[in-house]
């Protein structure tokens, strides 16, 4: 299971992008993340913006109501709004849909004039050239492990039925990327050569990725990113990734059941190619962070043990598990609602760590217990030993993540409260990669 370290991983880049726009327009801005700074200022603001995912929409409504009672106008955006603007319109007076770069200047102008509209939306013609690097000047990063996170793009060219991106695509959203010059400039501005790209899909445009990595090659980075399984079809790009310092790739394998994958539109994933995919990364010294979703329609109680067996047999370095969750606005939600299988409408439980649907081939209790069991089994000391990476250079980062983030994460969390989470992150980076 994840500890609250996950929520303290890095600042929210969406809010920091808005902060950049606000600063560019000549205004003062303060960014607060409730995960790392629960004391929210209550006065001294002319406008409040809230970014929310589905699971915190209700919290956003409560918080927004508190500010409105103080006479402060409130606008709400984020993936929870962009993926289902109709639902959000019922909850909030003013919503923002799509990339902030396409409408936040209008929000600021209208707020200054006292005439906020009900809805602001970035048009479908929005160009990735308009995407901005975020500003970190307005946020206290000491409550986060890292501030070396960069998003080179927004969205994903795929639209898997259970993913936020499938809902966003229904409302005109699409994959766009920044310019190579913009991303490279942001990389160079960081005080570290360790970079985490947090794009939904770092190879959404393989041509862009190749051009970007070629530009970054001289910097000699250590970096990680998330990619889709079709990276296996791009051996030249994998070679370039390894040559430019790629340490780990997050990949949504999602299931060891082919029927489960086909049932949610995950056509780019082929179970028969999973072993080759893992080997393609390992042979280049790149670690695999495998994501799995449990509770899909072909899953049954045996799925959990088979997943653990596959992970151990293929020496997968890290595993992230999720419970199948029907985000409102997605095709998966529509089908679960149509089939009468949604058993919990409390949006705060839509965080992939609660069972909110009735699975086909097991009970909700079996699904939850199996989800927890995968975490426990993958991160036993014995299985951590069995999954040791072949590449010696990856041994220290592997052990740090498996032991001090997953297995003993609670102890690392306590250390963060004692010395500061930013210092914990800096110590981990130096121990793993011998760089600042």
Language-model features and meaning:
Residues 31-35, 51, 167, 227, ...:
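Residue-level recognition of beta-strand->loop/alpha-helix junctions
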Residues 83-87, 207, 259-264, 294-302, ...:
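Flexible glycine/acidic-rich beta-alpha junction loops that bind and position SAM and/or redox cofactors
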Residues 132-289, 296, 302-305, 309:
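Radical SAM [4Fe-4S] cluster-binding motif and immediate context
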Residues 26, 31, 46, 91, ...:
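Radical SAM enzyme core and accessory elements
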